[in-house]
Amino acid sequence: MADVVWAVRHGERRDSVDPDWETVAERVHDPPLTELGRWAAWRVGRRFVEREPPVDAVYASPFLRAVETAAEITAETDARFMLEPGLGEHRNADWFDAEPETLPFERLTARFERLSADHEPLVTPGFPETHAEAMTRIGRTTRQIADATDGTALLVGHGATIGGVVAGLVGSADAVDAPLCGLTRLVSDDDGWRLDFSGDTTHLDV
């Protein structure tokens, strides 16, 4: 079982800065990172190289912004990562008219050399889902990952992912902060899981 779980939100996404995104997008709800977003993700990777103990397992939401964030991190840490739909975005009916489209797995594995083809998804999200259902789904996924990992796990996802990860392990997301490429750390000891810190972005202060 894992003794440390890290969670990180993806970097800046293109549709947040490009007013023309919806007119040019192949998949309107699956934008890539901006250059700034890739830089911030790279800085997360540098933090793990320079300041933190090694990570034993990396899982990412299948949305492109999270995949690209994981790819930047693992390029620095010389690791591989796995796609886990259970860490994906909240399927909020106010945001999406239907299940949001992401790149097929085959296209992702062809594009990202550090993406492992060996992982079988643990949890498949339903559409639509309430906020409570999304938190439950992400929490269940997190506990399964923690149970399957020896050592340290890093989970790459969305703002909702960070809340679900923390709530799934400690029972509440009240202390969660989820800025772009902010890091949250949870630690397990004899008394169970505790939230060490949330939303740390000191690695971006360069």
Question: What is each residue range found by the language model?
Answer:
Residues 1-3, 90-104, 167-206:
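Acidic, low-complexity terminal tails and accessory targeting/binding regions
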Residues 2-83:
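Active-site-proximal alpha-helix that buttresses catalytic centers in soluble enzyme cores
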Residues 5, 149-159:
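Generic beta-sheet signal
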Residues 31-32, 77-137, 196-198:
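Phosphate-handling substructures
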Residues 51-54, 145-151:
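Glycine-rich phosphate-binding loop signature in dinucleotide/nucleotide-binding domains
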Residues 60-61, 136, 156-157:
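Short beta-strand scaffold positions
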Residues 65, 161-162:
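Alpha-helix capping/helix-boundary segments
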Residues 72, 164, 168:
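Active-site signature of alpha/beta-hydrolase-fold catalytic machinery across serine-
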